[in-house]
Amino acid sequence: MASRSSTRIPAPLMLTIWIALALGCVRLTSSLDGRPLAAAGIVVTGDKAVNIYTSSQTGSIIIKLLPNMPKDKEACAKAPLEAYNRTLTTLLTPLGDSIRRIQESVTTSGGRRQRRFIGAIIGSVALGVATAAQITAASALIQANQNAANILRLKESIAATNEAVHEVTDGLSQLAVAVGKMQQFVNDQFNNTTQELDCIKITHEVGVELNLYLTELTTVFGPQITSPALNQLTIQALYNLAGGNMDYLLTKLGLGNNQLSSLIGSGLITGNPILYDSQTQLLGIQVTLPSVGNLNNMRATYLETSSVSTTKGFASALVPKVVTQVGSVIEELDTSYCIETDLDLYCTRIVTFPMSPGIYSCLTGNTSACMYSKTEGALTTPYMTLKGSVIANCKMTTCRCADPPGIISQNYGEAVSLIDRHSCNVLSLDGITLRLSGEFDAAYQKNVSILNSQVIVTGNLDISTELGNANNSISNALNKLEESNSKLDKVNVRLTNTSALITYIVLTVISLVCGILSLVLACYLMHKQKAQQKTLLWLGNNTLDQMRATTKA
C-alpha cells in the first residue's frame, strides 16, 4: 500500500487533467498558421507540447560501490580492490558525515529541533550560508531518515548479493532498488563466462574499470565536498553512478520510455544522498521525479519578429513571444512557471493572458491589423532562417546571391523578402554564407506592405521625442490661452454685474416690444393706405363711366 501511494496522482494534478480533458472536447480549428505572417516579419519558429507536473514520486536507489569477486579470483583482484576501497572511503566520508549530522539534528522537542536543524544546515555549508534549496534538501533528507535506517538494517544482505539489480522491499516505505554498476562488470567479465583468465589480466582489467568508476564518482561528488548532502544530483549524475540499471527504478516508478528522453533534458529528475556506509560501501540516493499530465489539445507556439521596412523606417511587430491555442481561443502564454525542453513545456501551472482584438486578428492572418514598433536598433540582425529558407530585410542589408550570381532587390513598399532555394541556392548576408534548401509554398503571402497607421513608438527615445513634441504643443496652447486671458482682463468688469445685466435684459425686452408694435403699426398703416387707394380708384372709375354715359346721351 505504501509503495502504491507514492505513485498516486495528486489531487491538484488530477484536477488539472480533468480540466484539460474538458478543454479537449472543444473541436480544434486549424493551428496558428505562420505562413501568411512571414512576409509581415512575424515568424513561427516552432511548437511544443504543454504538460502539467508536480514533483511527488520518490524512490530509493541503493548503489553497491564495492563488487563481490568470484572466490577463485578474489586473490587476483585483492590489491586493486583494497586501493579502490580506501579511495572510496576518503572521497565519500565527508558525504556520510554531513548526512549523519543533519539526521542526528532531529529531536523530540519542537523548538529545540528547529534550532538544531538550522544549525546543522548552516554548519555544513560553505561560509555558513544556507540557501532555500539547501534547507529544502535537508528537510527531505530528514524525512527519508527512517527509510535510510531500514536500508542500513539490510546492508549486509545487499552487500553480499551478486545480483546487479534487485528490489529491496523488506520494511521500506517506498520502492527501493539495489544496483551495482561494478557488480554488473564483474558478472559480465568473470561470473558469466567460462573463459580462463590469468591473474595478471584479471588484476589489470579490474584495476582499469575501478579507476574509471572512481573518476565518475569524483565527477559527481568532487564539487560537492563543501556541502555534499545538500546538493541535488542530476539525472546525468545518477546514470554515472548506476549505469543503465537506473532505467529499472524509473520504469518501476511508472516513467515510460516516451517520457524519459524529454524529462532527462528538463532537469526534473533529481536525487539526494540519504546514506553512506563505509563498511559495506553502500550509497543510498532518494530519487524524485515528477507526475506528468499531458494536455493533449494544448501546445505552445513560439513567435519571433524580423525587422521590416516601413515608410517611417525600420520596425518590428508587436506580438507575444509565446502563444497557446485551444479550439478557437488564442492567448499569450506565460512560460515563467514552465521548464522548457526541445519538444515539451513542463509547467507547475498554466497562466495565460487575453490578447487585444487587433493582435488576435493579426495572428490569424490579417496582416493589416498588425502593429509595429520603431524600436529596432542599427545592430539588429535584419534576417532570420526558417526551415532552410531566409526571411530578410534586403533594404537594411545587401542580399547577395552567389548561385546564381546576382543581387536580390526588395520592391518598394515590401516589408521583407522571402528567399528560398528557387530564387537563390547560396545566399550571402553580411559576410555569412548560407546554402538554402527550403521553399516557401503558395500559402506564404508576399508583397506585404506596412501602413503608416500601423507603426507606433514604444522605445524610450522615441517616446521622449513624442513627449517633447506634445509638450511644445501644450506650451503653444498655454501661450494662446494667456493671450486670451489678457484680452478678457481688459473688459470692464463693472459692466457685467447683476444689476447691469438686469437692466440690459429689461431694455432688450422693451426694445423688442417697441419693435414689434412698430412693425404692427407699419403693417396697419400700409393696409389702410392700400384700402384708400382702392376706394379712390373705384370712385374714379365710376365717375368716368357716368361721363361716358352722359356723352352718349
Curated annotation (Swiss-Prot):
The keyword Lipoprotein applies. Glycans are attached at residues 85, 191-192, 366, 447, 471. The chain crosses the membrane at residues 501-521. The inactive precursor F0 is glycosylated and proteolytically cleaved into F1 and F2 to be functionally active. The cleavage is mediated by cellular proteases during the transport and maturation of the polypeptide. Residues 1-31 form the signal peptide. GO terms for cellular component: host cell plasma membrane; membrane; viral envelope; virion membrane. It is a single-pass type I membrane protein; Single-pass membrane protein. Residues 522-553 are cytoplasmic. Residues 142-170, 466-491 form a coiled coil. The record marks 116-117 as: Cleavage. Residues 117-141 are annotated as: Fusion peptide. Residues 32-500 are extracellular. Disulfide bonds join 76-199, 338-347, 362-370, 394-399, 401-424. The keyword Calcium does not apply. A lipid is attached at residue 523 (S-palmitoyl cysteine). It holds the Pfam family Fusion_gly. Homotrimer of disulfide-linked F1-F2. Belongs to the paramyxoviruses fusion glycoprotein family. Class I viral fusion protein. Under the current model, the protein has at least 3 conformational states: pre-fusion native state, pre-hairpin intermediate state, and post-fusion hairpin state. During viral and plasma cell membrane fusion, the heptad repeat (HR) regions assume a trimer-of-hairpins structure, positioning the fusion peptide in close proximity to the C-terminal region of the ectodomain. The formation of this structure appears to drive apposition and subsequent fusion of viral and plasma cell membranes. This is Fusion glycoprotein F0.
